[in-house]
UniProtKB/Swiss-Prot annotation:
Species: Sarcophaga peregrina
Lineage: Eukaryota, Metazoa, Ecdysozoa, Arthropoda, Hexapoda
Biased composition regions of type Basic and acidic residues, renumbered to the chain: 89-100, 109-124
SUPFAM superfamilies (alphabetical): beta-beta-alpha zinc fingers
Protein's GO biological process: DNA-templated transcription; regulation of transcription by RNA polymerase II
Domain of life (superkingdom): Eukaryota
Alphabetized GO MF terms: DNA-binding transcription factor activity, RNA polymerase II-specific; RNA polymerase II transcription regulatory region sequence-specific DNA binding; zinc ion binding
Chief subcellular location: nucleus
Cell compartments where the protein resides: Nucleus
Name of the protein described by the UniProt record: AT-rich binding protein
Length: 354
């Protein structure tokens, strides 16, 4: 028959009536009674001891009607209300360790208490000092706040004045720039429109250098007088026109001259030299290059065919300068390479007659 026990640390089994203690090597054991602190060597002896000496599970003769559970609960309540110190066999080393740990715990508990007391004392001193300052110098504090407010107002006023000055300066600069731009436009616009509109039968360079008539309607009085007095309109024009504009004007002049020649001569020379009539009365054009002799129904087809012999590409791209034999090839090139749509004026290279 056993008894209730609870396993815990330090090789001990605690019950509500006794403690089961082991030796350090775990070979010897003893049981200590909680009620009378008597040491017993076996569990049977301890069980008999608590039954005989302390009436556990039996009770006195006049209380035979009580159950064992009631007796156990009464004994447990009595032990809980008046707990007795446990008997322990502790070595000297364990005792020293316990003393050191207990002293360290006490020091750790004292330190926060001392720190809190010091903080409370410092807070009290600070509050007292602030109260003294408020009592002694209330006027000085109000004066300082008033001075600070005045300084802030002055700084704000200065900043506003600086911003206004900067805005005025910017407006003046913008007005000056606009005036300068208008003056430059008045001086340069009449000179830019003095390009000759009629091409004389001379070279392109002579046409550019020839002095045009000075238009003084759109010029100011001072600018017109300066232009008439200096008589340097051709040189200023040459300086104003860039090289690209001169090159384009030369090409346009040559193209117009060539087109005029072709329009006047194609109807006579082409028909006279290469136009033939068949037996059926149908008119056709024959290529007269060496031994070619190909026949074409239209003169435009003959001109395209002649570019094969002359290796001249009449249609040139105005963006990249690539040249083509036919206008359709130029249009496809412009769509694919430059993503341009629609028809524009293509740069025509004059055809060579042979």
């Amino acid at each position: 028959m056993g008894f209730p026990r609870i396993i815990s640390k330090n090789n001990k089994i605690y019950t509500k009536l006794g403690a089961f203690c082991l030796s350090g090597d775990g070979q010897q054991f003893w049981i200590v009674c909680h009620t009378c602190q008597e040491e017993l060597q076996t569990q049977d002896k301890f069980w008999k001891h608590i039954q005989d000496e302390h009436n556990f599970m039996h009770g006195p003769k006049q209380e035979q009607g009580r159950t064992a559970a009631q007796a156990y609960m009464e004994a447990a309540e009595a032990a809980a209300m008046t707990p007795l110190p446990l008997y322990r066999k502790v070595s000297e080393n364990d005792q020293q360790r316990d003393d050191v740990v207990s002293t360290e715990d006490e020091d750790m508990q004292k330190e926060p208490k001392d720190y809190t007391e010091m903080r409370a004392h410092d807070d009290q001193q600070q509050t007292a000092a602030v109260a003294i300052d408020i009592k002694l110098e209330p006027s000085s504090l109000s004066q300082q706040s008033a001075v600070q407010a005045q300084q802030q107002q002055q700084q704000q006023q200065q900043q506003q004045q600086q911003q206004q000055q900067q805005q005025q300066q910017q407006e003046q600069l913008q007005q000056q720039q606009q005036q300068q731009q208008t003056q430059q436009i008045e001086i340069t616009t009449p000179l830019m429109y003095q390009i000759p509109q009629v091409h004389p039968p001379v070279s392109a360079y002579a046409a550019l250098v020839q002095a045009p008539a000075i238009n003084t309607l759109n010029m100011s009085v001072a600018a017109a007088a300066a232009a008439v007095a200096s008589n340097q309109v051709p040189s200023t024009m040459a300086n104003l026109l860039p090289q690209e504009l001169q090159y384009k004007q030369e090409l346009q002049y040559k193209q117009e001259v060539q087109q005029h020649k072709e329009s006047t001569n194609n109807s006579t020379t082409a028909s006279a030299s290469s136009a033939m009539s068949s037996d059926d009365g149908e008119r056709f054009y024959i290529c007269d290059f060496e031994n070619c002799g190909l026949k074409f129904k239209y003169h435009s087809r003959l001109e395209l065919h002649r570019s094969v012999h002359s290796k001249v590409r009449r249609f040139a791209c105005e963006i990249c300068g690539a040249s083509f034999k036919q206008s359709c090839n130029l249009s496809t090139h412009r769509k694919k390479k430059h993503a341009l749509k629609g028809t524009t004026k293509a740069t025509l290279v004059p055809s060579q007659s042979f």
